[in-house]
């Protein structure tokens, strides 16, 4: 079970809604993933329509919605988007995203921390997308964020856990859930994140652009379950030396 703020989730896999060929394929993939928390960009939701092609099927699927502020370039823009989301969707939950450079989509640490502090004070449950910076993640935790979401690699890059060393420090020192977000490209990346101690992963592009998104979503579900089970099972420690799994000389001595 995963506890974040006032909610509990059975699944440790969070999913996104972008890049799918259709809303039907999006919903089928989310169901196959077992995900219970789904993020969506407010800039893609038509708040004037009651039958929005993205929002309506998500509500029907019964998942918890995590609106995000993707597209915001400053703290002020993110705070404005957060209030729109709360009014439109009736939720205090928010994935805080501030990335001023459209080419790299890297989160702005200064603006993110500034916005997070304000939004927490205004009653939001803030889950900030941030760089894999242990100092920043600790500061975000200290201002009241319900979880931290450090990147594994740039958004949509499918590079995997390129920031592994920093992620390990973040996980070790965190007292709130750590969700590895961005860059996860294949199920094995997700399994590795859970094995190393992450509480969850958020996957979007790797599922949405797959030749078979539904089966890829299922593969990610199984990988996350395997990674979590492996960690809970207590894997053996790494060694620079070989260790025999059976006696090497006993049978020779017995036959002498």
UniProtKB/Swiss-Prot annotation:
Binding site for 1-deoxy-D-xylulose 5-phosphate: 156, 182-183, 204-205
GO cellular component, as recorded: cytoplasm
Keywords: Cytoplasm, Schiff base, Thiamine biosynthesis, Transferase
InterPro entries membership: Aldolase_TIM, Thiazole_synthase_ThiG, ThiG
GO molecular function: thiazole synthase activity
Pfam families in the record: ThiG
Catalytic residues identified in the record: 95 (schiff-base intermediate with dxp)
PANTHER family xrefs: THIAZOLE SYNTHASE
HAMAP family: ThiG
Protein name: Thiazole synthase
Taxonomic lineage: Bacteria, Pseudomonadati, Pseudomonadota, Gammaproteobacteria, Enterobacterales
Gene this chain is encoded by: thiG
């Amino acid at each position: 079970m995963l506890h974040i703020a006032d909610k509990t989730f059975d699944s440790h896999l969070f999913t996104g809604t972008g890049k799918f060929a259709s809303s039907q394929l999006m919903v089928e993939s989310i169901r196959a993933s077992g995900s219970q928390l789904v993020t969506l960009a407010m800039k893609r939701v038509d708040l004037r329509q009651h039958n929005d092609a993205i929002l309506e099927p998500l509500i029907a699927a019964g998942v918890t919605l995590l609106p995000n502020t993707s597209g915001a370039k400053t703290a002020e823009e993110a705070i404005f988007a957060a209030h729109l989301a709360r009014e439109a969707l009736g939720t205090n939950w928010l994935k805080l995203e501030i990335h001023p450079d459209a080419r790299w989509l890297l989160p702005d640490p200064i603006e993110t921390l500034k916005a997070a502090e304000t939004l927490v004070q205004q009653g939001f449950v803030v889950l900030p997308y941030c760089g894999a910076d242990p100092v920043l993640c600790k500061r975000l935790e200290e201002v009241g964020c319900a979880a931290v979401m450090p990147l594994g690699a740039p958004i949509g890059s499918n590079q995997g856990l390129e920031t592994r060393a920093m992620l390990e420090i973040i996980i070790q020192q965190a007292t709130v859930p750590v969700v590895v977000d961005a860059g996860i490209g294949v199920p094995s990346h997700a399994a590795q994140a859970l094995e190393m101690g992450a509480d969850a992963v958020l996957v979007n592009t790797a599922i949405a652009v797959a030749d078979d998104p539904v089966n890829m979503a299922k593969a990610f579900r199984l990988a996350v379950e395997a990674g979590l089970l492996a960690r809970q099972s207590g894997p053996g420690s790494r060694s620079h030396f070989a260790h025999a799994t059976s006696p090497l000389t006993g049978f020779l001595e017995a036959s002498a």
